[in-house]
Regions:
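Conserved binding/catalytic microenvironments
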Residues: 1-180
């Protein structure tokens, strides 16, 4: 929280996109420490700043609505609202620029983990399949970590045909070191 607050304090003249980013970081940090009111206040600040930024026009390659929805998802998750986190992550995926393949793989895998957490195995498998579509085209340790996690989460469900099909497909795509 202190780092996020320090970054925001060091940028008093930042533009609305940067303010949205910083408020999103502060919201996530506050949520991680259990400060619900502060987290929600910072999310509102981030949304307001993003509205101002979007009214000025699109800025490819900077903090955008997909990033804001990612932060909203993280805050909701940290505050125990898994369904709300899933909705925000789905919205993030919907508005993310197609060139952000690495983030798409990681965030879709995270979305699948959350879908599984609330018992939606079929939806999780569909989302993991989408993540695997892009996975061979990225090089990312964090994406690898998500694929490794996927294998572990799927193992208890391998009697389910959908889960087994996903597991088998992933084994043909992922490096053997991630399957162990």
């Amino acid at each position: 929280v202190e780092l996020a607050d320090a970054a925001a304090a060091a940028s008093p003249k930042a533009g609305p996109r940067m303010l949205a980013f910083l408020a999103g970081q502060q919201a996530h940090a506050a949520a991680q420490t259990g400060d619900r009111n502060r987290a929600l206040r910072y999310i509102r600040e981030a949304e307001t700043a993003m509205d101002r930024a979007e009214s000025r026009g699109k800025a490819f390659g900077s903090y955008d609505p997909a990033s804001l929805n990612y932060h909203i998802s993280q805050v909701r998750y940290e505050l125990g609202d898994v369904s709300g986190a899933i909705e925000a992550m789905q919205q993030s995926d919907k508005v993310r620029y197609s060139v952000y393949r690495r983030a798409r793989v990681r965030h879709r895998a995270m979305l699948a983990e959350r879908q599984l957490e609330i018992g939606h195995l079929e939806a999780a498998c569909d989302t993991w399949h989408q993540a695997l579509d892009d996975y061979p085209m990225v090089q990312s340790g964090r994406a690898d970590d998500r694929v490794r996690t996927m294998f572990g989460l799927l193992r208890p469900h391998l009697k389910n045909t959908t889960a087994r099909d996903l597991y088998d497909r992933a084994r043909t795509i992922a490096p053997p070191s991630l399957v162990s």
